[in-house]
Every structure is written in C-alpha cells, then in structure tokens.
Amino acid sequence: MKGCAGVWNIADDLIVHGKDIEEHDVRLFAVLDRLSEVGLTVNGDKCQFRRTKLTFFGHELTSNGVNPSEEKLAAIRDARPPKDVTEVRSFMGLVQYSAKFMPDLASLAKPIQELTRKGVTFKWGAEQQRSFQELNKLITQAETLAYYQVCCRTRIVADASPVGLGSVLKQQQGGVWRIISYASKCLSDVECRYSQTEKEALALVRACERFSVYVTGETFELETDHKPLERIYSRTYVKALRAN
C-alpha cells in the first residue's frame, strides 16, 4: 500500500478513509487498482463500504473519533473480581488494551497490579475492590478520542503522583482542545523515593517518549503545573546559571 493515501493496514485487514465520500472513493479505487496490479483479490462478503462507523481491532472508529468497542467495554464491565494471580493478569490485560482511554490508569490500578509481583501473597481486600470498581467506572465513561492531525496545535501535559506518572496528548481542533490519548506508568521502588520535582521532571520525559511517534520532528507544547520546574527551565534562570 506504499504511496496510497488514506489507507491503514494490519496484516491483511485494510481500512480506507477520506474526509468525504468523494475523497474516500478516489482513495478506495486507488487501493483496488494496486491490489489488482499485484494479483490480489478481496472477498466481497467481508468488505464494508462507505461506513460512518466501523469496529476494528477492539476500537470503534467513527467520523468524530475513536471509542473502545462495545465488546471490550462489556468484557471489563462484566468481569468478576479476580480470585487468583492468573485472573488478575487476565483482567489487567483487558484494561491495558484500552489504556489510552483511561487517565492515570497506572496509579489507579496499582493496588491490583501489585498482586502480580513476585513474592506477594494474593489477598483481595477493600483497596483492591475499590480499584476494581473505579477501573470499571472509568472505562465505561471513557470519552471519545480525536484522531491526530499533523497540522493542528499539539500539547503534551504531564503530572506525577507519589506512585505513578500520568500524561495526555491533546490537540486544538476546530478551536477546541481534544484528547488524542492518555498514558500512565507506575513508579519503581527507587523512583518512588525521588523528590517531587524529580518525579515531575521524569513525568515530562516519559510523556515525550510515550508520544514520540506523534511529536518527533514536530513543534509541540509541553505543560507542567509544577512551579519549580517552570523556574528551573525558564530562559531567565538558565541564562543566570550560564552567567555564573
């Protein structure tokens, strides 16, 4: 599909998209021509054309953005509290698949995730049950994520809690800031002993790494609410350090 505009593929599954029907059809015919050139055919019974909504690899793709598929939502919503470590891993696998829809997931899921650590005795208590219920609530209330657009103003916001790092990639589209993706990560035992300023700085680094596929080579804004970091990285402060 190299050189064909508006087409995504995963293995032998193809999605062709366009901003309107005319653009969609032009791109679709280009893809069909390419397949014909290399001697490939498609199964008409498995094709869906001119759709405004499509479920693809656990995601519901619409003209307005991306949502978790109803199948993924139901799997989490209907899950029972885990009874052993194997069931914990299975549940967390379901949750992690939809992680980009869930802010501060790592911190929220930490009481459950801790049960998978080596040497930890499995014990499902009140803290794990609260985390389980909050995760169910969070995913079922997930907002629609926007599609990333190269031409739009882009911002990464990062924050740190005592036990985890959280970040969000957003863009200003049509005069409104929309979420592209959330990301989060638990702190290691060593990182938990960092000062808060060090944690906040680490959050910025990890956020840029996590969203590097979007922002590498692009101009973007990096936002933190930690005032000491703003001071440390301000141009005035850096110039003063160089002067000394």
Kindly give the residue locations of the regions a language model identified:
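C-terminal accessory regions
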Residues: E221-E223
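Short, intrinsically disordered, charge-balanced linker/junction segments flanking boundaries
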Residues: V238-N244
